[in-house]
């Protein structure tokens, strides 16, 4: 079993937004159903609807590079099924959020 990440002695807080979507080659029945429903409501210009997941979390790390590496690992291990899903994320440092 892999070691748990060690909490750094001095860390910064980061607000993280993770977007998980099905790979383009994977059928999206939920997206198809939403697209059909919108078109039935008269929104004929709607096409290529894809349904995904949006995740927000706060992460403490010594620096943004470490936060990015940890977030990438979290996505690979749990937050996304990388066989059928792609993911991307945004990291924003929280102002003045340094913890001892």
UniProtKB/Swiss-Prot annotation:
Q: Where in the cell is it found?
A: Cytoplasm
Q: State the superkingdom.
A: Bacteria
Can the keyword Cell inner membrane be found in this entry's annotation?
no
Q: Which Gene3D superfamilies match?
A: Phosphoribosylformylglycinamidine synthase subunit PurS
Question: Per its UniProt entry, what is the enzyme's top EC class, as one word?
Answer: ligase
EC numbers for this chain: 6.3.5.3
**Pathway, per record:** Purine metabolism; IMP biosynthesis via de novo pathway; 5-amino-1-(5-phospho-D-ribosyl)imidazole from N(2)-formyl-N(1)-(5-phospho-D-ribosyl)glycinamide: step 1/2
Q: Does the keyword Calcium apply?
A: no
**GO biological process annotations for this chain's record?**
'de novo' IMP biosynthetic process
Write down the Pfam families for this protein, in alphabetical order.
PurS
Q: Which InterPro entries match?
A: PurS, PurS-like_sf
What is the catalytic activity of this protein? N(2)-formyl-N(1)-(5-phospho-beta-D-ribosyl)glycinamide + L-glutamine + ATP + H2O = 2-formamido-N(1)-(5-O-phospho-beta-D-ribosyl)acetamidine + L-glutamate + ADP + phosphate + H(+)
Q: What is its main location?
A: cytoplasm
Q: Name one GO molecular function term.
A: ATP binding
Query: Family per UniProt?
Result: Belongs to the PurS family.
Its name, as the record gives it, is Phosphoribosylformylglycinamidine synthase subunit PurS
Q: What is the lineage of its organism?
A: Bacteria, Bacillati, Cyanobacteriota, Cyanophyceae, Synechococcales
Q: Which gene encodes it?
A: purS
